[in-house]
């Protein structure tokens, strides 16, 4: 009598976790995420971003934790692409950010932050200092 409970309980927990995590992703974010990913690959300007498109690393254990990890990672990807403005401050303080870089296709000055895979356009204000402005894709 114990064996069915051992099998059914993790399965029920697995399904509940998947459903619970998928409720946090609005449909518009998912649609925008797909559209942005298509455009990003088309522009060929997202070399750092391609790393986060993988669903899960190969060494990650399969099962409940894998499902939760994939959904959380997808949710983070959509939120990152659709836009969170608070990362602008974190980008300015990031020690890993490299200098201005020219895009292959657009030719615009841009700066890439490898830690968060964000792409910014370098905008010069009147004082001559450079600040980072997030590119609007939508």
From Swiss-Prot:
This is Secreted RxLR effector protein 91. The keyword Protease does not apply. Has the canonical translocation RxLR motif, but lacks the canonical EER motif, which characterizes most oomycete effectors identified so far. A motif (RxLR) lies at residues 34-37. Residues 1-18 form the signal peptide. Secreted effector that completely suppresses the host cell death induced by cell death-inducing proteins. Belongs to the RxLR effector family. Disulfide bonds: none annotated. It comes from the Eukaryota. Keywords: Glycoprotein, Host nucleus, Secreted, Signal, Virulence. It is found in: Secreted; Host nucleus. Glycans are attached at residue 93. One of its GO terms (cellular component) is host cell nucleus.
